[in-house]
Amino acid sequence: MDFRLTEEQRALRDGTRELLAKRFGRERLRAAVDAPGLDRALWRELGGAGFFALRLPERAGGVGLGLPEAVLVLEEAGRALLPGPLVACQLLAGAVDGVAAGERIVALCEAERDPVLWEHPGDCDELILVEGGAGRGGAGPGGGSGDGPGGALRGAQGRTGGACRSAADRIARAPFTSLDPLTPLARVTDLRRTAPLALDVPRLRREAALLTAAQQLGSAVRTVEMAVGHAREREQFGVPIGTFQAIKHLCAQMLVRAEIARSAVYAAAVTERADEVTAAKLLADEAAVRNARDCLQVHGGMGFTWDVDVHLHLKRAWLRAERWGSAREAEELLADGLLA
Amino acid sequence: MDLTYSPEEEDFRARLRTWLGEVLPGLPPKPAARDWPGRRAYDTAWQRMLFDAGYAGLHWPRDAGGQGATPTQHLIFLEETERAGAPYVGANFVGLLHAGPTLAAEGSPGQRARWLPPILRGDDVWCQGFSEPDAGSDLAALRTRAVRDGDSYVVSGAKIWTSHAEVADWCELLVRTDPDVPRHRGISWLAMPMDAPGVTVRPLRTLAGSTEFAEVFLDEVRIPVGNRVGAENDGWRVTMVTLSFERGTAFVGEVVACRRVLGALARAARANGRWDDDVLRRTLGRLNAEFAALWRLTQWNVSEAQHGGGVPGTGGSVFKLRYSHARQELYDAAAEVLGAGALDADHEWVADRLSSLSYTIAAGTSQIQKNIVAERVLGLPKGR
């Protein structure tokens, strides 16, 4: 047993970080806030670098790596606040033509959520609708113990579900003002089920949750760095605010959250166990959201402004926390698991 | 990122499991929680069984009498012994987990030959004389004085929070050997026999009702200079070696135990109807995630230690911070499950709930740990 990253994994992480720093630095990030359309050239560049084809076998033009490597890459994307349906394109690279190379952009949509939300509707070529997740009867308000505690959820987990695809221009949608300025959303008003797509949906859900958790982890780590960087430089009462124990303790707690989430996310990437993925998503969601809030607190009044990037991390963290299993659903599933 | 165990490690696990299956049914019943002489006898007898079977000092180096096992094997040992319900390290805690490793790392050949074998055989029990009444978390403020007189130090002062002092043979004692230099530089590390004239032990009763630790008063106790480990006034550095062992590996078996208790809590709640409480059920689900992650963090830390020279790194502070609070949340949840039964002081979960209150204080309070993480890991400036 050696849980640490291999040399190749560290190189992949560092290389991804460098690529994103070069192509999606702070200036590009702030420009995207004002004009949130996806940069097709960047998308193709990411495709060319193997960002989406990471897990495809080499004979299919892929890189032949595994889920742990995909997690490391998406952690970096989360750090950089890179926008776009990254998880969808990573998961559908082998299933939809052109996605692996970054030529076509697809999004995933969870049919059982209400409202049914679609990320980057103006930038997508196709939308893949996924059905058969944790039903609202099990996870919504007032649910949970209809047919015995956790029964509805257990049943939902067992459902195989299905997926279907639609060209983006054939989907009826209603406007929806996104909380996250970097992630435009639309509400899907007509769930078309005409073109089924053969996918292992339970597996897709599991991997989508894990890769989303990986982005949350990257964001949680980044906000620790932002808080610490600010605490070292910002002076009050003639000293850096980082000398104050109250600030130190906020920062230390942020690191603890991020590192606990890292252990959970990396382990789930290795074992691919459903319970570990659920736990990883729960802890990474919390780390991203809580760390962004604490980072905002450390930044004081400036943290509450649009000028500082903290709100972008918080809003994206909230958005991701709503996708592929909420805290409530995760806790119910994990409670149920204790009785198994 | 590899979480599979090698064939050698799996073989080690299988042999250990077989041995535990053979010997555990024949163990005498556990002594009462407050019977410290009984617990000493029980714990040292178990240590002797480990010694005879070749499992004593598993993670100690071979030249110190240990088995030279890898940190991963040590992890497997702690996992399997806890899973099988084997006795915990108990009264041998200080000797095996920090005094011994410190002596192995810093002692002279003569000191190692004298003190290490009796720890491994279960003959000697050690206690820790670090903390003082006026120097809690600020360990370097200690005032117990040692004045050189020929071949001896004459030691006077008082120690506190000394676990197992009532039944210990030896004490790892920090003393001030030079009061005129900056406070970290005038400290020495001594091995003190607990039966030396001038040593008085006054057991302290914890809020859990146990006398697991004591105050130790030292009145002109003569300790041979040859009992000093490391150079005179170099005790602070030796102490840091000790503390890194204490923080890094001391809680591994407990995480396994907490995961077992969490499952038992869920089943008990299902049986008594408390499971229908959404808040409680979600708390248990969340704790499931927490303890699973803490176990993975342990594996991460062990992997780091295995490749970084064996002394656990700062991951220990991150672990300790989260674990100490998660343990308290676990037993608070147990009280929710028990309802009025949580007022029964003899219930195992209630006793553990009480003792869990010490976890955010002992071995460096959460507040001190946060300072360590902020300053040494995150590089924030020192406070005033």
Question: What name fits each language-model region?
Answer:
Chain A
Residues 1-80, 148, 210-340:
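Alpha-helical interface subdomain recognition
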